[in-house]
């Protein structure tokens, strides 16, 4: 694993809001990730989240039908698959996330297997953290390419520098370009950057980075594994997102999200 970051890489990440690390996984590691992620997805069957009544009503399940049309999306695989858990709990990944954001520690917010199916439509522009249950400038996501990610099969696009603020979120079902109508200042930023990657490469992006993904115009599925991290010490903002029902109901706005059974600490300098 290519897990050593240079000062230049950290500076680039903080300026642009994202970074691509080529050949993050070596050949053997890539095959291991492909197998273990694939097995975890297969064992989950048709369930986006762990098969537990405590997840009924979560935002992820509300959008299950819409997502199914173009994504095979499976979340929180670490909760019910030990081989995968060992991959995503790798302290080296957590340290990279903490170093890029300059925080003392990170917890898992959500992992997601994102398999963009053949001929699937685009993924609209969005920011991650405004959808989540905490407000933080230092949320961060790793996106690992299990297949080559190309302009033709659904690579990510990042708008450099867009991680400096939150933007108005378009109403569900509105056109892809609606975010630019609501937030014309985005048009003043550099043009979207296509994050093409060879299999085994990865990107990190800040939780406020405006990003999306192109359509898959090929007959093959494009596989990726992602994980969003929140800074240790983050507090609850009142949104449910993917929190289990019982835990969600136990929280008050401002409570620290430090339940290791829901948001495990994967790296800390302390």
Regions found by a protein language model. Give the residues of each.
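Short, structured patches in soluble enzyme cores that scaffold and shape functional sites
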Residues: 110-112, 127-129, 144-148, 160, ...
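A short beta-loop-beta micro-motif enriched in histidine and acidic residues
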Residues: 101, 128-139, 190-191, 197, ...
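Double-stranded beta-helix
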Residues: 11, 149-210, 234, 254
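Short, conserved beta-strand element in jelly-roll/cupin
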Residues: 133-151, 196, 204, 228-232
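Non-heme Fe(II)-dependent double-stranded beta-helix
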Residues: 1-15, 22-125, 131, 240, ...
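Active-site region of the double-stranded beta-helix
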Residues: 103-104, 129-135, 145-155, 163
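Non-heme Fe(II)/2-oxoglutarate
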Residues: 43, 47-50, 60, 172, ...
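A short secondary-structure junction signal
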Residues: 121-127, 136, 152-158, 167-171, ...
């Amino acid at each position: 694993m290519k897990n050593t970051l240079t000062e230049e890489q950290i500076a680039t990440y903080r300026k642009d809001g994202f970074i691509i690390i080529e050949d993050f996984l070596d050949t053997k590691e890539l095959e291991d990730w492909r197998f273990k992620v694939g097995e975890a997805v297969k064992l989950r069957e048709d369930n986006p989240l762990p098969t537990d009544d405590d997840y009924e009503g979560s935002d992820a399940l509300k959008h299950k039908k819409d997502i199914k049309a173009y994504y095979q999306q499976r979340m929180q695989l670490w909760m019910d698959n030990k081989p995968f858990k060992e991959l995503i709990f790798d302290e080296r990944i957590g340290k990279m996330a903490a170093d890029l954001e300059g925080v003392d520690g990170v917890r898992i917010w959500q992992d997601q297997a994102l398999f963009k199916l053949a001929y699937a439509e685009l993924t609209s522009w969005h920011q991650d953290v405004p959808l989540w249950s905490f407000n933080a400038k230092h949320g961060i996501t790793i996106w690992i390419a299990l297949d080559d990610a190309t302009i033709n099969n659904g690579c990510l696009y990042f708008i450099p520098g867009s991680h400096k603020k939150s933007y108005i979120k378009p109403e569900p079902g509105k056109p892809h370009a609606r975010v630019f109508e609501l937030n014309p200042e985005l048009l003043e930023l550099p043009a979207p950057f296509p994050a093409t990657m060879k299999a085994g490469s990865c990107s990190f992006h800040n939780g406020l980075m405006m990003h999306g993904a192109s359509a898959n115009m090929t007959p093959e599925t494009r596989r990726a594994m992602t994980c969003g991290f929140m800074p240790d010490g983050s507090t609850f903002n009142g949104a449910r997102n993917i929190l289990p029902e019982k835990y969600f109901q136990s929280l008050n706005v401002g409570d620290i999200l430090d339940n290791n059974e829901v948001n495990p600490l994967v790296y800390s300098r302390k």
